[in-house]
Structure formats: C-alpha cells, structure tokens
Amino acid sequence: LLFCIFLFACNQVDNKQVDNQNQEQFQEWKVGNFHYSEGSFKYLIHRTTDYQEEFLLQDGLLVRFKLNWENDSVYTMKFDSILSNPNQTQLAFDITQIQKKCTMTKVTAHSYIERSENNLNDLVGLTRIIKNTRD
C-alpha cells in the first residue's frame, strides 16, 4: 500500500512538470511573429495579446482579427478590419462575418498545428503555424 501511494505521488509530480512545460510552450505562441502557407499562398502573422494581423504576401492584403483566449491553447478570432488591400482583392466569402475557434495541437518550440472551425461552414482546418526565426 505504501508503495502504491509513493508511485501515485511521483506520478503527480511528473504530471505537474509536464503541465508547466506545456504551459510555457503555449505562452510562447500568444505574442509574436509567425507564418503559414495554404497551397501557393503565404501568410505572415503578427500577434499581440488582443489582435492577430494576417498579411497575404502575394496580394498585400492585411486583415486584423480580434483575439479572445479561452485558455492556454484555445482562442477565437473574429474579423476586426481590413488594414490594407492595395490590389482590391476580391474575397471568396464575407470575411467580415467570419469567426474562427482555434486549438493549438502538437505544440513544439518551432511550430504547432492549428485545428480551426469557423461559423461559415462545417469544415475543420488543420494548419501548421511556424515561428519566424527573426522577429
């Protein structure tokens, strides 16, 4: 019995260390400069505690989303404004209505997989978000 209690106590300490490491990894992704690709399109991300700006390299389109963090690994993005659209890019859907719920999965020091769902369709998106090597 004493041995079982000892094993349980050791596992609890190990789990807390893992939780603290995960929390630190998630914290590194809340603010910073990142990028991702979808097909031939390349996007740059600038994220603050309250907003995420996404810049489409090919068109110069710059869109800002309001961020709401539900916990360390889940956040929602809601359209805020188009900051720049020099080529008058036509969007395939009404971006002003979009709201995405994103979950960080497979988090490492260099990237994570964003699992996203939005209010415009029933599709689940999986996108690798990569930390820029120079901020």
Question: What is the predicted function of each stretch?
Answer:
Residues L1-C4:
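Sec-dependent signal peptide recognition
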Residues L7-A9:
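C-terminal motif of bacterial Sec signal peptides marking the signal peptidase cleavage site
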Residues N11-D14:
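Bacterial signal peptide processing site
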Residues D19-S40:
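Tryptophan-anchored aromatic micro-motifs
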Residues Y43-V74:
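N-terminal glycine/threonine-rich, aromatic-flanked beta-hairpin/loop signature
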Residues E70-D72, N119-D135:
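Edge beta-strand at a domain terminus
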Residues F79-T105:
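An anionic, turn-rich surface loop/hairpin at beta-sheet edges
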Residues T103-T105, Y112-L126:
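Short, exposed beta-strand-loop hairpins at the edges of beta-sheets
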